[in-house]
């Protein structure tokens, strides 16, 4: 059975990779589908994210990387996938993902959403958090694949960190 794991992956984290690896054990094939959303200001281009995810998942023979525009459920239908794979960290993730699952089901009754809870060590992790840490020069090597850590370091050593006002 084919599953689609959609997201922006800006950047991919070890939490994402954990879900991908576990999904790859459950499904015959997993498509990591990188959403192109022109409304969001991404740190990395879609092309960079494709390369990052491909490098991070190269050890998984039943995982492929693709991009899409538009509705996730329509992308899944175009790929003949009947399962959306989603990761859950906290209760608020579940509330949002449940709403999205019902919405997707209303758009295409054949689609199912499979939720995997994140492993404990990644329950706090998000791409936004990683970018914030990297932006201020913090170490992110334990949060993202090695290739992504290098990309983040290169990105933020070229971009000056805004100065903060001294504490009074």
UniProtKB/Swiss-Prot annotation:
The gene is coaD. Pathway: Cofactor biosynthesis; coenzyme A biosynthesis; CoA from (R)-pantothenate: step 4/5. Reversibly transfers an adenylyl group from ATP to 4'-phosphopantetheine, yielding dephospho-CoA (dPCoA) and pyrophosphate. GO terms for biological process: coenzyme A biosynthetic process. Its cofactor is Mg(2+). Keywords: ATP-binding, Coenzyme A biosynthesis, Cytoplasm, Magnesium, Nucleotide-binding, Nucleotidyltransferase, Transferase. Substrate binds at residues 8, 40, 72, 86. ATP binds at residues 8-9, 16, 87-89, 97, 122-128. Its EC number is 2.7.7.3. Homohexamer. InterPro entries: Cyt_trans-like (IPR004821), PPAT (IPR001980), Rossmann-like_a/b/a_fold (IPR014729). This is Phosphopantetheine adenylyltransferase. Its main location: cytoplasm. It comes from Thermosynechococcus vestitus (strain NIES-2133 / IAM M-273 / BP-1). It is found in: Cytoplasm. Gene3D superfamilies: HUPs. Belongs to the bacterial CoaD family. It comes from the Bacteria. GO terms for cellular component: cytoplasm. GO terms for molecular function: ATP binding; pantetheine-phosphate adenylyltransferase activity. It catalyses: (R)-4'-phosphopantetheine + ATP + H(+) = 3'-dephospho-CoA + diphosphate. Signal peptide: none annotated. SUPFAM superfamilies: Nucleotidylyl transferase. The record marks 16 as: Transition state stabilizer. NCBIfam families: coaD_prev_kdtB (TIGR01510), cyt_tran_rel (TIGR00125).
